[in-house]
Amino acid sequence: MGFLTVLYLSLAALSVTNAAQIMSAPNGAEVVPNGYIVVMKDDTSKQDFASHRVWVSGIHHNITRRGLDGEGVKQTYDFDNLRGYSGIFDKDTIKDISNDPKVAFVEPDAIISQHVVVQQRKAPWGLSRLSNRKGGRNYVFDSTAGAGVWAYVVDSGVDIRHAEFRGRAVWGSNQVDNQNSDGTGHGTHVAGTIAGKTYGIAKKAKVIAVKVLNSEGKGPTSGIIAGINWSINNARQNGMLHKSVINMSLGGSYSAGLNHATAQAIKAGIFVSVSAGNDNINSNNNSPASEKSVCTIAASTEDDGKASFSNWGPAVDLYAPGHNILSARPGGGSQVMSGTSMAAPHACGVAAYLIAKEGIPGSRACLRLKQLSQPTIHNPGPDTTRRLLYNGSGR
């Protein structure tokens, strides 16, 4: 047994009375069996984090040697101001982990889903609406069109060969399976709204596919966090932190870990757009929609009303078109989808557009969107903004 392991065993034994909270899964939440996310305290150094992982590996080795079930650590997260990991652990191991004084909290690894509700055949209208204060049939935009901005689509994958992207889409990371493709069409539709040549807002932006949802449109919270972590690191490595946007048209039950991870992207300088959810309830109970620093987007209809399915509440920053939205589908062609999943990429696209046009950093883009927005939603829901997305075209 190494010195670091002995040291950590000693510290854990001394800290039982100060054990970190082991959160319960929200009622009705689908969770990964024996899956947990462990978040360290803010003041945990890289050295302390490394020592903790050595100690956890030692515990896991002892478990497997005794023939008990448990896969151990599967993913590690290392943001600027947040460190943690996820994995499969038995209850005794999780109890030991929670006793480490460097652990802030432990929560179940819940399943996250895409926010799409219906598909119909109908003409698009969202682009023209966001570029005209009182509505119109034409999409009016500046020729910069998101040039020089990177859009990370944290979703079900993207058909990067689709003609809508004209070679501007690339594969980034896969945190959920070994299929580098879009199994649901959701991510491709979202990407098309952000940056497609026909259906997109920021028509010159680069699209980066970050797959976190499987062919059923679901994925573990741990994988979503890993996708965010990868996106931040990739933007940093390429000098794009303040010229990048992230879209997450997904959500699930409240997760402190997911909210903390999403906030790290904002702190790093990246704009983040998330969908409010499709349950017609207060979005304060969902993640990542409830994270205050992100831009949470609810869905509007063609007549500037709240879409019947859209979540609402004080967490909502803006409304954007989310009903009967036409965009790209895998394999070529297009399809119509509805949902707050379709509203969020409208905001993400306008953010990318404004970053390129006005030179604002991504971390300030949500504020700029709210400054430009118009108070036209006529039935927004209790304690909810009336403001509708607008690109500032002057029309």
Curated annotation (Swiss-Prot):
Keywords in alphabetical order, please: Glycoprotein, Hydrolase, Protease, Secreted, Serine protease, Signal, Virulence, Zymogen
Q: Which PANTHER family match?
A: CEREVISIN-RELATED, PEPTIDASE S8
What GO annotations for molecular function exist for this entry?
A: serine-type endopeptidase activity
Instruction: Please name the catalytic residues of this protein.
Output: 155, 186, 341
Specify the protein name: Subtilisin-like protease 5
Q: Where is the Inhibitor I9 domain?
A: 36-112
Point out the signal peptide segment.
Answer: 1-19
Taxonomically, the superkingdom here is Eukaryota
Q: Which organism is it from?
A: Arthroderma otae (strain ATCC MYA-4605 / CBS 113480) (Microsporum canis)
